[in-house]
Amino acid sequence: MQEGQNRKTSSLSILAIAGVEPYQEKPGEEYMNEAQLAHFRRILEAWRNQLRDEVDRTVTHMQDEAANFPDPVDRAAQEEEFSLELRNRDRERKLIKKIEKTLKKVEDEDFGYCESCGVEIGIRRLEARPTADLCIDCKTLAEIREKQMAG
């Protein structure tokens, strides 16, 4: 059960992992100033490190648990467990790449703006989803279009 709890990466746990409180904007503060960029850099780096630790734990777990079971049912169960873990790690590897892309945007001071329309994404949305690259309006439109294409 402990391992399952560690895998939850809600926005609140991402902030907790990074050891940061939600950002408190000051009146008249410029959007994506140095303090805000540092805040998100800390969050993204901590999230990336946590995911890398998970990948390392999985590799160690699979090496430790690898056994050649004579019983075909036991062997199949172990292979299914490993397959599920590998799919999860693959998703996490893709997320790590997205985090690294986002960190590059932070470094280039191009972070926090919608890639579609250029407006500010917003501090709260970015704390909830630090890798967001669309504002809520553009994301909603993209989801509606996606739904129409699928339906």
Curated annotation (Swiss-Prot):
Coiled-coil intervals, chain numbering: 33-54
Cellular localisation: Cytoplasm
Function: Transcription factor that acts by binding directly to the RNA polymerase (RNAP). Required for negative regulation of rRNA expression and positive regulation of several amino acid biosynthesis promoters. Also required for regulation of fis expression. Binding to RNAP disrupts interaction of RNAP with DNA, inhibits formation of initiation complexes, and amplifies effects of ppGpp and the initiating NTP on rRNA transcription. Inhibits transcript elongation, exonucleolytic RNA cleavage and pyrophosphorolysis, and increases intrinsic termination.
Other observations noted: Dosage-dependent suppressor of a dnaK deletion mutation. It suppressed not only the temperature-sensitive growth but also the filamentous phenotype of the dnaK deletion strain, while the defect of lambda growth is not suppressed.
Protein's name in the database: RNA polymerase-binding transcription factor DksA
Lineage of the species this protein comes from: Bacteria, Pseudomonadati, Pseudomonadota, Gammaproteobacteria, Enterobacterales
ZnF bounds (dksA C4-type): 114-138
Origin superkingdom: Bacteria
Keywords, sorted A to Z: Coiled coil, Cytoplasm, Metal-binding, Zinc, Zinc-finger
Gene that specifies this protein: dksA
Family from the record: Belongs to the DksA family.
One term under GO cellular component: cytoplasm
Effect on the protein upon substituting D74N: Does not increase ppGpp-dependent inhibition of transcription, but retains its ability to bind to RNAP. Increased transcription of its own RNA
Protein induction: Expression levels are constant during exponential and stationary phase (at protein level). Negatively regulates its own transcription, translationally activated by CsrA.
Gene Ontology MF annotations: guanosine tetraphosphate binding; zinc ion binding
Pfam family, one: DksA_N
Subunit structure: Interacts directly with the RNA polymerase.
Residues the entry annotates as binding Zn(2+): C114, C117, C135, C138
Gene Ontology process terms (BP): double-strand break repair; regulation of DNA-templated transcription
